[in-house]
Amino acid sequence: MKPRLIGEAYEIRFADDAILCFQHKEDAEKVLRVLPKRFEKFGLTLHPEKTRLIEFGRHAARNARKQGKKPETFDFLGFKHLCARSRKGKFTVHVKTLAKRLRRGLKAIADWSKQYRHKPVDEQQKTLNAKLRGHYQYYGRPTNYHSIRQFYRRVCRIWREWLSRRTRGQPLTWDRYSVILRQHPLLLPRITHAWVGAGSYA
């Protein structure tokens, strides 16, 4: 199929998810027409909600403004991808944690904190820091600091909530909780990946 295309084309794949990038819209439309038939030969189908054609790249923002719209975005591997500009005004791609992934991660933290709230504080700290470290290692992208900081702050609140529920009579005030955090600090958010950027029709 690729030799029949007008311009450049690329595929980004992970497991059964993939992004097809095309230099020209005509190529993208051609592949979108042919792909379902190719899949049928192998007993496969395209996901109706995930399969769509969008303009994404250095010209997308300008073209969207002409139509009074915002550039389209797409979700892939737990991130929302957005058209953006660097400090020097060049096109780049920004990512942020998908809201549903953020909620899922926080629910897992809350469920764990509830179940193990009676364990010693230092043991809870070690496990929570391991969970935070794993979150930062995956989501710690240069343009995603706001999201991982939001995750950290919510985890701090969740931990206080469940530590407070194990005390009888005297609630765990923020002042007392601040002392616990100084003695047993939670891992601060940090960027763990180098900067990358790209763009085209996707």
Which residues does each PLM region occupy?
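Non-catalytic terminal/accessory segments
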Residues: 1-202
